[in-house]
């Protein structure tokens, strides 16, 4: 997943990720967490809210930067999957 999200410094908002299964098979997300970092330094981390096939993360970046990374780790059945999103703060 190569997605990019923009924030204006001072914003506090939700990022929603939709998880899809290959071949539209039914599935359940059993757990999900995130890390929000810049150059390897973690600024925020926690659990995602799970709503059916959506993962909800609320972020409030502390500094302007073009290079934040949001990494989401979630579990479906017996597999662990990850998604990365680039976050720019202007």
Model-derived segments and spans:
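Contiguous segments within soluble domain cores/interaction surfaces
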Residues: 1-90
């Amino acid at each position: 997943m190569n997605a990019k999200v923009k924030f204006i410094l001072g914003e506090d908002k939700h990022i929603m990720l939709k998880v899809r299964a290959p071949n539209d098979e039914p599935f359940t997300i059993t757990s999900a967490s995130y890390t929000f970092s810049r150059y390897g330094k973690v600024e925020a981390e926690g659990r995602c809210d799970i709503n059916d096939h959506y993962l909800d993360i609320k972020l409030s970046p502390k500094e302007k930067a073009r290079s934040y990374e949001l990494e989401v780790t979630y579990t479906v059945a017996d597999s662990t999957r990850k998604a990365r999103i680039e976050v720019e703060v202007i």
